[in-house]
Amino acid sequence: MLNIDQVLYVDSQIEHFSNHIIKQDTHYGQEIISESLMAKSTVGQQNRDRTKNDINTLTPLLSTNMQRSVNLSKEKGASSWLTTLPLKTHGFTLHKQAFRDALSLRYGWTPNKLPSKCACGSSFTVEHVLSCAKGGFPSIRHNEIRDLTADLLSEVCNNVCTEPELLPVTGENLAGASANIQPGARLDIAANGVWGGSFERTYFDVRVFNPHAASNRHTDPQTVYRKHEQIKKRAYEQRILDIEQASFSPLVLSATGGLAREATTFYKRLASMLVSKWDQSYSSTLCWLRCRLTFSLLRSLIQAIRGSRSSSGHPFRSGAIDLVISETHLHQ
């Protein structure tokens, strides 16, 4: 509810502008325009303050699980799937069950009609299935972000590739016990021209973590982001700097749509590069980019919950195809 001062302020502004409308005054000066913008800004700030106060009042009344889910949904871009128009031509739609599942995930509720057991034998909970490797869903989630990012980089950068193989370590001294010195090591994406000139190469490695996992759910999300960024840096950064003579950027995202600090910086940079290519405003391009990332993650979450885990990885049982064709006399 508005307090008395806010009500009086709004009423005075309405009366002020109504007088100009009644008089059909089309020659108002810059002063009126400035007052109009100021009034709009003031009312908007009052609404934001009121909403913030309501959130601060209601949040402590929620369960711990729901508090965490709500805080995750408040991260920048994590709720863009809910505020964008559901246009199928742009890929921003969910069918009705997926929409209900998305709302359940948003508020920490258990989606309806879930099985009691996972195909791996564990209890079927949201926390478990978002991390369960059976069926390959964590890899699908990771690859979706990798491929989307690589496709967008291809719009504005050169020499873009996925899963680039790193140069071998041949006697170089890499500090840190966790540094990856394995031959044939690969990262997710490499591109030229991201942070510098067209010959400056940058390597990226994507990590999408489950914020509801037992190892994460009792830790502040920002701390979890930093932890995963540091793991990636300790494994690859010095090798990239010293041997590849390039730069390294870890792209850490939560499965619920949030971004770590360096991922946020990178996607802002990518949006600014796409602006000049697509001739769009920076704010709308960044909003679109966040929405694409969020929808990709959201669909992968729903697939992990509703998808089948029973057949993935099972070999196709058949004889050699040439023998089958020969013995059965198959002809087109």
Predicted segments, located by residue:
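Acidic catalytic cores of enzymes that act on phosphate-bearing nucleotides/polynucleotides
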Residues: 1-109
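Generic recognition of well-structured, leucine-rich alpha-helical segments
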Residues: 24, 152, 156, 160, ...
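Active-site metal-binding core of divalent-cation-utilizing nuclease and nuclease-like domains
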Residues: 93-125, 148, 152-216, 225-231, ...
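Short Cys/His-based metal-binding microdomains
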Residues: 115-145
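Intrinsic disorder
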Residues: 126, 136-143, 198, 223-230, ...
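E2/UBC-UEV (E2-variant) core
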Residues: 208-257, 264-290
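Domain-level recognition of nuclease-like catalytic cores that cleave nucleotide substrates
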Residues: 253-332
